[in-house]
Amino acid sequence: MDKTQSSQGKCPVMHGANSAVASNNMDWWPKALNLDILHQHDKKTDPMDPKFNYRDAFNSLDLAAVKRDLNALMTDSQDWWPADWGHYGGLMIRMAWHSAGTYRVADGRGGAGTGNQRFAPLNSWPDNANLDKARRLLWPIKKKYGNKLSWADLMILAGNVAYESMGLKTYGFAGGREDIWHPEKDIYWGSEKQWLAPTENPNSRYSGERDLENPLAAVMMGLIYVNPEGVDGKPDPLRTAQDVRVTFARMAMNDEETVALTAGGHTVGKCHGNGKAQDLGPEPEGEELEAQGLGWLNKKGPGTGANAVTSGLEGAWTTHPTQWDNGYFHLLLNYDWELKKSPAGASQWEPINIKEEDKVVSVGDPNRKFNPIMTDADMAMKMDPEYRKISEKFYQDPAYFSEVFARAWFKLTHRDLGPKSRYLGPEVPNEDLLWQDPIPSVDYRLDASEIVELKAKLLASGLSVSDLVATAWDSARTFRGSDFRGGANGARIRLAPQKDWQANEPERLQKVLKVLIELQASLSKKVSIADLIVLGGAAAIEKAAHAAGVKITVPFIPGRGDATQEMTDVESFAVLEPLHDAYRNWQKKDYVVQPEEMMLDRTQLMGLTAHEMTVLIGGMRVLGTNYGGTRHGVFTDKVGVLTNDFFVNLTDMAYNWKPAGSNLYEIVERKTGAVKWTATRVDLVFGSNSILRSYAEVYAQDDAKEKFVHDFVAAWTKVMNADRFDLA
């Protein structure tokens, strides 16, 4: 046999790290710290030009023209995916709803803000079946308007226009959502290994009676909300009502908003289950190349229009599924309902003895009519006592229902867009809403000389470097890049609930705030407490850097306002409470998750990279900002001086590192055996993890003293300005 024949059938390429058959580091060492969540959305993956600014691009968009095109699309039925009753409104609303509906208030992740429905896993979730068709229908419009209109904005706008085209007066629309270019790595969707895994399966998201794992909101892997057939697919409206209440609360919705959204979402459109689910092909990510990113293709027939299969339930909720009306409550409340099976075998509720005029015209044959249907979640709106009261009120007052729904829909689709200062476009409502975390604008300016004078007064106030730095940090660290909440702007650290959070050391905080408020009152110039808090941190860092022999000016841009208690929803802000903070070497209690894992999660939410995290930890330790003044990780004899001592001593082989208790270690001199310092896991991980050690070594080098200070200041400034959307 010659060499040519013997080599036939072998793979012609070397298997690299991108090969599906290759094992990666996490396969070999599953307990290793995975820094990937800090390394996502790199500019290398972004196809936009370096100078591209989406805000500027969107502001140049003719939004009215886009809406005209979207209105035309709604009734321009395509043969490859026909519109139900000649109107795509229901499909577009479901797409927008499911884009926004992944948001959860606990960590601010999910939601409509990034266009992530285009990528795995969301593009292939069972609950998102056939939304790939909705996005393909939108492609001509996305293609036409190009970079002026992100997919993220287009999907929400399409849902808005769909409602408007069917008769609802919407509350408004804001653009400003920038697309990502690959799946997110930081969002925890659950630990289940199969779609729609029931509660009793391994790795369930439930414990106890029915306690849903934090921060999850959906009841099953692959669902946006609740199971439409009932808890674990077993119909029981009262049990489902409990799931609905928990799920919507974790999306920051109250009972009235929940009923409005459920009813308003089901006033239009239909469910699809007129066929066999087993006839459908794989989801988009599991399909073959020739499917070109589409999934759920019917292998035994057209599988479109009247024969489409999506959820498995079959039918519309209302008599007129292409118009906005009060028909949902008319049918739900005036008829008795019984359990039936759809053609696909799914459990659904249908009315008993329904009048002919209340039936729904068939999608495929205008001469035929069918029963409307309700899901188990819809029946919960009737069976649950509290939901029933709200449903009755909406039924009796259709105008009130329309208004509440329009506002709830706006909240649903804009919750993760952040404060109103990030909103773009001519349809932004004028009203300031409490859930937008409003902050009053400022009416003063500070020039360079006034800033210098203020810094001198702050340093002469009697507050220490650690007090000023820790207070500024505590004020700013609440920022979440997931939904753009929190941060130093507004100075809500002086208001409930933040002033009483254990993480903020209330007694120390009140001492610092008292000094700052007195200083503010003594000034001839108007300055917000929010600006004074941040400027105090800047002044303290400059002093600490100067003591280390490095002269530097910490960038400071005034303009932060002071929020009032009336502008602050205490319950809404409660989810921002830090339960751990590696930067101040503190956690409220021991958790199942290791401290270093929680450090990465907090770091990612603040929008920091791995090397920014590294330099900030090292700087915060030597500045003496540990919670309660503990000495863990303070590897220096010059506390309050901004040196690179943390890294120098961390990487020094003159020391041994020994466990001394739960999350506690002793740093021992090798020669004498004497304990030199103590440390926690979030200190020693910078010497243990190979990636973090590589950063630590950079800052430990003899030529790194100035670089360390400059990098620390840059990372610090990034945190302080994270919520300054007015500077974008």
Curated annotation (Swiss-Prot):
Residues of the signal peptide: 1-22
GO CC annotation: cytosol
Enzyme class, broadest EC rank: oxidoreductase
Textual note on the cofactor: Binds 1 heme b (iron(II)-protoporphyrin IX) group per dimer.
Biological process according to GO: cellular response to hydrogen peroxide; hydrogen peroxide catabolic process
Tryptophyl-tyrosyl-methioninium (Tyr-Met) (with W-97) crosslink location in chain: Y225-M251
Site (Transition state stabilizer): R94
Sections of the chain in a coiled coil: none
Residues given in the record as heme b binding sites: H266
Enzyme Commission (EC) number: 1.11.1.21
GO molecular function, one term: heme binding
Catalyzed reaction equations: H2O2 + AH2 = A + 2 H2O; 2 H2O2 = O2 + 2 H2O
Modified how: Formation of the three residue Trp-Tyr-Met cross-link is important for the catalase, but not the peroxidase activity of the enzyme.
Cross-link Tryptophyl-tyrosyl-methioninium (Trp-Tyr) (with M-251) residue location(s): W97-Y225
Subunit architecture: Homodimer or homotetramer.
Family: Belongs to the peroxidase family. Peroxidase/catalase subfamily.
Function: Bifunctional enzyme with both catalase and broad-spectrum peroxidase activity.
Name this polypeptide is given: Catalase-peroxidase 1
Annotated organism of origin: Shewanella sp. (strain ANA-3)
Gene behind the chain: katG1
